[in-house]
């Protein structure tokens, strides 16, 4: 029995993390065995890489270094956690995955798409999301929400133009792959967002 792989994507302040918990509980209520994880992270080694990636003290990090660290964390995450869970028939919910790399390192940093594609082929292979839920929010709203946090990490400290590029990349990818993406208006109040998610959960129940 094979499981299902669902990823949650979006810019800063989109509310992915809090709604990930709601979504996991909704699926468990339907009798699913759910594993929740995140990227970068998900394993002890990958979480250590996450700390390096996000530490404000590492502001001089080269963009290529950032890209390689992201894929190093992902390789460990896939091998140690995601693939075994899917093989057990579990539903894997992951806060960010490959689309985030195309948005942040590709569009945000302007890194070469051929380099990202080569690393994708090496690391991802055939482990692809069954569905990706995009939490879309205007950049100014997301930045205002993120700004309320105790301290901004290295990525959150980027400028408005950086996050504009990220949002446009996400929307473009959603338009290119409508069968995989479901876009949620994350600028709405939490109750409205969860109503949108409830409809997506209903759709998942129809999966064979």
Swiss-Prot record:
InterPro entries linked to this entry: P-loop_NTPase, Thymidylate_kin-like_dom, Thymidylate_kinase
Source domain of life: Bacteria
Broad enzyme group: transferase
Pfam family, one: Thymidylate_kin
EC annotation from Swiss-Prot or TrEMBL: 2.7.4.9
Reactions accelerated catalytically: dTMP + ATP = dTDP + ADP
A GO cellular component annotation in the UniProt record: cytosol
GO molecular function: ATP binding; dTMP kinase activity
CDD domains: TMPK
Keywords: ATP-binding, Kinase, Nucleotide biosynthesis, Nucleotide-binding, Transferase
Any single biological process term in GO: dTDP biosynthetic process
Binding site for ATP: 10-17
Family stated for the protein in its record: Belongs to the thymidylate kinase family.
Name by which UniProt lists this protein: Thymidylate kinase
Organism: Alcanivorax borkumensis (strain ATCC 700651 / DSM 11573 / NCIMB 13689 / SK2)
